[in-house]
Design a protein with these regions (language model features):
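A generic structural motif
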Residues: 28-32
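Short amphipathic alpha-helix with an adjacent loop that forms part of the alpha/beta core around
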Residues: 56-63
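Short N-terminal binding/cap micro-motifs at the start of the first secondary-structure element
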Residues: 12-17, 41
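Extreme N-terminal starter segment of soluble prokaryotic enzymes
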Residues: 1-4
Length: 73
């Protein structure tokens, strides 16, 4: 199975970010949402609270096939 890491931060555009995660998961790609903020609790650009799967520094990148850097405002 392919594996992707999506980096989220405070200010992430939630529709764009969650759409990418959803499409990858539908394609049976393992998706890890990683926080680039040093904490798992995040707030999107429109004030929606999100929880990352892991902190970016804790992810094992040795078998990652794709990394997505998402827009933040």
């Amino acid at each position: 199975m392919s594996k992707a890491v999506l980096f989220f931060a405070d200010g992430t555009e939630e529709c764009e970010a969650l759409l990418v995660a959803d499409l990858l998961r539908r394609a049976r790609v393992e998706v890890i949402i990683a926080s680039a903020m040093g904490r798992r609790a995040l707030v999107s650009s429109h004030g929606i609270h999100l929880n990352a799967d892991a902190l970016a520094e804790d992810v094992d990148y040795s078998d990652v096939d794709m990394v997505c850097l998402l827009y933040t405002s």
